Regions:
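Conserved P-loop/Walker A NTP-binding site and adjacent catalytic elements of P-loop NTPases
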Residues: 244-397, 401-409, 413, 417-420, ...
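Conserved segment of the helicase C-terminal RecA-like domain
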Residues: 600-602, 607-643
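C-terminal or mid-to-C-terminal helical accessory/interaction module adjacent to the motor/catalytic core
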Residues: 625-704, 722, 925
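Conserved C-terminal RecA-like helicase domain
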Residues: 295-296, 305-308, 313-326, 496-576, ...
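Helicase-associated low-complexity/disordered flanking segments
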Residues: 2-256, 261-266, 518-537, 542-543, ...
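A short beta-strand element within the Helicase C-terminal
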Residues: 576, 583-599, 628-631
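Conserved interdomain linker/interface between the two RecA-like ATPase lobes of SF2 helicase motors
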Residues: 406, 411-418, 423-504, 551
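C-terminal helical accessory/scaffold domains
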Residues: 666, 695, 699, 703-713, ...
Length: 1003
């Protein structure tokens, strides 16, 4: 028998055993004739078995069941270092040698004998009580708490080691695949892999623990070796970013006292100055050194996905998580992780939802840093109010969270800094020199800043002369084709146009003016791009332009088309991109030359901020050696453009006033502020209190007006209503008064609106729609549910009423029933076709039903071009409606979860949101979950044999580049890292669930 580690005696004390035994024998004087039998069976018998004095001395516990004897044998395994054991009596030690059946028979016979005795004494209540006392005294013997804790810790460590093994296996798949590991053979889940212990075939748990400790030590020792990051980060920046040393301003910024002391900071530099790199280093420090999570706020979904793509390689190697919060993606609230930290990359709206969910669960302290890109958007209508709400809420909570903002175009930088209570760091640095020009007539003038008393001066540079024919001159009087041909095809050029239609016209014009060398450049890549665009159903004009290395890029294109064009532009297959101003603030596409076709954005004259964003795309480090910008300006437009250039960047003013009620409502719902004075204090933390002309009395008035509106709408309530007093304000027509100490609470509708991150108007309309649907929901298909999540403003789409009747006539039974429920009949369709007004059905219902029919066709996987043609809409509009509906479905699911009477809709809408996100074939769904992987790329991967994310995770860059056409090695590496990051996140989600269970069990 293996040696048994001696532990402290935990059985009943000997003196106490003798006392209870004497009482027991006296109480059974009437059954003395059976005392011998009882003594043999008594669990407190002093009878011993000679199996070692050590065991006999320490253990005299009752017999254990056979299964516990088996557990003892497991504990006494080959591992002699075990520090825990189960104390057993000599009887148990002896019986453990017997077979299980023999042990069971002995136990059964003795139990039967005891039962005979007990039957004789059941009439004596006093004797029964004595027996109960003795039984309780005997069987409540417990192990030492330290031994129990050790068992719990061992169990917990074993589970955590299993997850660590899986994570390291994914991170080191390159080495694992070399050893022909079967970690990612075709299986359905990681749980199966863990359960079957396939991971133990190539990694031993002890080795993992030792390697983990070595890595942790290395991280600590390597701090401050590469700008405060582990030394491995230096190699990652070199490999994936081609960065070996930071710019001087970046080093200066990272070593600021405000950064060291974790004070809030705003840093402002021109576009392309390297601002994002500083933010990334700060976030890496936060998750690696301080072990806190970081939140990165970005303005657009495309930029979120681009940043997820870029940081995945760092996350896999440095062992942290990158989580996407955009559109329908992201867990609300986020998974609570105890082993790894996360960088949450989110849009403004999703960032607010994330912060609110953490506050509600008292987990906001898990975030240590919030970084806001394009901070100037705080002054933009709509989204600016959401961003201000987010930042004001964080400031008011006072949770020691550092806020870092960055922007190139803030006119009132110090006012924004006052609002954020932040230090300011400002430099005028560009790694690539930018030369700015203005074209007046045929003369190109260079813009000289600061040379004139008024701040800007034009200096004649050269006269433009090209070998244009008379026909070409008539076609292109502004000489745009000549300006483009000076840099392409060897260089790249962005042409900013005022409208989407203008983008298409300019691209068509340039195709007619390009030379032969432009046509022959990268011909094979362009032919492949043509094929891909045709497969997406792109316009013939766009496909034709691609042959010349020219394309247009605007919101009217589907996201798959835009993604293909962006990749082609980066690879050089597309040399000229005609785009709208939204590209300047969106996807990162630098150029050697930027041309602004006219000083207009839509119908409005260009602002200095928009101008800075556009020209900032010219000349990016590592991409172009020089940068040039040219504004084509007419003689009549020059005075106004000159005033814009001299006027300075517009200030970012608060746009919170219309949304102040939503801020106050969320504060009450989250119990941040539930009285009127505290709510005023919250408003004092906003940009509204800094940049507006509002005085403290105005802030008080805004607070009271907002409270009055919330009370009247029924989403806010006073806990204990009282009559008028000196410190009360009259806030409603029903003699409802609110005192300074009156507690406020939020109604169920208000809580649901906060959970769903909805405006009250949207929440009320959604509730009305759901209540109507609950009485007559059509579940023959998806149409009625799709109607419920169509944008409530119909996304600005007005249907073609002449086409409405033909759509109505083609409806199946599901469509007719849904239309009937909504009040739409054939008579209505006929009136629409004939142009007669409809009075019995609101126009917005007709518009939303039109969009619901469109979404149903997408749901049934009708191609985007066919849907766009059928409903007379641009493909970009179709995709925008689908994305908006998916987001609303996700919000509506959380809204319904807060209202018990709508529980059934919660399940339906949750499933709807997931499927509506892509509306792709089932085999493409998982691949399209990866960042920046659209349908076209997913189809390429599927044809190359990569059917699952796991297939991509175990692939090599060489295999991907050879199997997928026109995929660069760098893009292949990032795609592999993104796949591995996705799998690691799944494993960490399972770990979080396991840890939650163990926490519930107090393990």
């Amino acid at each position: 028998m293996h040696s048994i580690n001696k532990i402290k005696d935990t059985s009943t004390p000997k003196r106490r055993r003798l006392g209870t035994g004497r009482i027991f024998r006296l109480s059974l004087s009437k059954t003395a004739q059976k005392s011998d039998l009882l003594t043999d069976c008594s669990p407190i018998s002093s009878k011993s078995v000679d199996i070692g004095a050590d065991a006999t001395e320490r253990c005299d516990s009752p017999l254990l069941p056979c299964n516990q004897v088996e557990f003892r044998s497991i504990c006494d395994s080959d591992n002699n270092n075990s520090s825990f054991d189960v104390p057993c009596s000599p009887d148990v030690l002896q019986s453990s040698v017997k077979s299980e059946w023999e042990s069971l028979n002995v136990c059964t016979s003795k139990i039967n004998e005891i039962c005979e005795i007990n039957n004789e004494i059941t009439n004596n209540q006093a004797q029964t009580e004595v027996l109960e006392d003795i039984s309780e005294d005997m069987f409540q013997s417990k192990l030492e708490q330290s031994d129990i804790n050790h068992v719990d810790k061992s169990f917990k460590d074993k589970i955590e080691q299993s997850f660590d093994i899986v994570n390291q296996s994914i991170s080191n798949l390159d080495e694992v695949m070399k050893n022909k590991s079967s970690m990612f053979e075709t299986r359905d889940s990681f749980l199966l892999d863990i359960k079957e212990d396939a991971i133990e075939k190539f990694v031993h748990p002890n080795q993992v623990v030792q390697e983990s400790k070595k890595k942790e030590t290395a991280v600590v020792n390597a701090n401050n070796t590469f700008y405060g990051l582990p030394l491995i980060a230096k190699g990652l920046f070199k490999t994936y970013r081609n960065i070996e040393k930071f710019y001087e301003w970046q080093e200066e910024c990272l070593n600021l006292e405000s950064v060291r002391e974790r004070r809030n900071l705003i840093y402002a530099l021109p576009t392309s100055g390297g601002k994002t790199l500083v933010a990334e280093v700060l976030m890496l420090r936060e998750v690696l050194n301080r072990k806190k999570n970081a939140l990165f706020i970005l303005p657009f979904v495309a930029i979120v996905q681009e940043k997820i793509w870029a940081l995945s390689t760092f996350a896999v190697q440095l062992e942290f998580l990158v989580e996407e919060y955009a559109a329908g993606k992201g867990h609300i609230p986020p998974k609570k992780r105890r082993r790894k930290n996360s960088i949450y990359i989110a849009t403004i709206e999703k960032g607010l939802a994330l912060v609110r969910s953490l506050i509600e669960l008292d987990r906001l302290h898990e975030i240590g840093l919030i970084v806001v890109d394009e901070l100037h958007l705080i002054g933009e209508k709509g989204r600016g109010g959401t961003l201000e709400t987010l930042l004001s809420t964080v400031i008011f909570t006072n949770q020691d969270i550092q806020i870092v903002g960055m922007s190139a175009t803030i006119g009132n930088l110090h006012e924004i800094a006052q609002f954020l209570r932040a230090d300011v760091f400002q430099r005028q640095f560009r790694p690539v020199e930018l030369t700015e020009y203005v074209k007046l007539g045929t003369m190109l003038h260079r813009v000289v800043w600061g040379a004139h008393a008024q701040g800007v001066e034009l200096v004649p540079h050269r006269e433009l002369k090209y070998d244009y024919s008379a026909a070409a001159t008539a076609l292109d009087p502004d000489l745009l084709g000549g300006l483009v041909s000076e840099v392409v095809p060897k260089g790249s050029c962005l042409v900013f146009c005022s409208t989407k239609r203008n983008c298409e016209n300019v691209a068509s014009l340039l195709c007619k003016l390009q030379r032969r060398e432009m046509i022959s450049h990268k011909k094979a890549e362009r032919q492949a791009l043509e094929s891909a665009l045709r497969a997406e159903g792109a316009n013939a004009e766009l496909v034709q332009a691609v042959r010349y290395g020219i394309a247009y890029h605007h919101a009217g294109l589907a996201s798959d088309e835009r993604s293909l064009l962006e990749q082609a532009y980066r690879s050089g297959a597309i040399s000229v991109l005609c785009c709208t101003s939204t590209l300047a603030a969106g996807v990162n596409l630098p150029a050697q030359r930027v041309i602004i076709r006219a000083p207009l954005v839509g119908r409005d004259f260009i602002t200095l901020g928009a101008y800075r964003q556009m020209v900032g795309r010219a000349g990016r480090a590592g991409v172009c050696e020089t940068g040039e910008s040219i504004v084509i300006c007419g003689s009549r437009e020059w005075p106004q453009l000159q005033a814009v250039l001299r006027g300075g960047i517009a200030a970012a003013r608060s746009v919170l006033r219309p949304g102040a009620g939503a801020l106050l409502l969320s504060a009450v719902a989250l119990k941040l502020a539930t009285t009127r004075p505290k709510l005023r204090t919250l408003l004092d933390c906003t940009l509204l209190a800094v940049t507006g002309d509002d005085t403290p009395s105005d802030i008080k008035s805004i607070c009271d007006d907002s409270l009055r509106s919330l009370l009247q709408s029924g989403v806010l309530e006073v806990v204990n209503k009282r009559q008028s007093g000196d410190d009360a304000s009259h806030l409603s027509e029903k003699d409802c008064y609110i005192y300074n100490d009156s507690e406020l609470t939020v109604s169920s509708l208000g809580k649901a609106a906060i959970k769903g991150c909805m405006d009250l108007s949207v929440a009320k309309q959604l509730l009305l729609d759901l209540e109507r649907a609950s009485r007559s929901l059509v579940l023959m298909g998806s149409l009625h549910l799709l109607y419920l999540v169509t944008p409530h403003d119909a996304a600005g789409v007005r249907p073609d009423y002449s086409h409405y009747y033909s759509l109505y006539c083609s409806l199946d039974e599901e469509g007719v029933q849904t239309a009937k429920i909504l009040g739409i009949t054939e008579h209505n369709a006929i009136r629409m076709m004939t142009g007669k007004p409809i009075k019995n059905v609101p126009e917005i219902v007709l518009c939303r039903f039109y969009l619901a029919l469109m979404l149903q066709d997408l749901w049934n996987q009708m191609p985007f071009p066919a849907v766009a043609y059928k409903y007379s809409l641009a493909r970009g509009t179709v995709q925008s409606v689908m994305s908006s509906s998916a987001s609303l479905a996700s919000c509506a699911a959380r809204f319904c979860a807060e209202l018990p009477r709508l529980w059934s809709f919660c399940a339906l809408l949750t499933e709807l949101a997931g499927r509506l996100q892509h509306c792709a074939a089932p085999e493409l769904q998982h691949l399209m979950e990866l960042p920046n992987v659209k349908k076209a790329r997913a189809m390429q991967l599927l044809r190359a044999g990569y059917k699952r994310v796991e297939d991509l995770a175990k692939a090599s860059a060489d295999e991907l580049t050879s199997g997928v056409s026109h995929l660069s090695r760098n893009a292949a590496n990032q795609l592999i890292s993104a796949a591995r990051m996705t799998l690691i996140e799944k494993v960490e989600n399972l770990r979080a669930e396991a840890e939650d269970v163990m926490e519930e069990l107090n393990v």
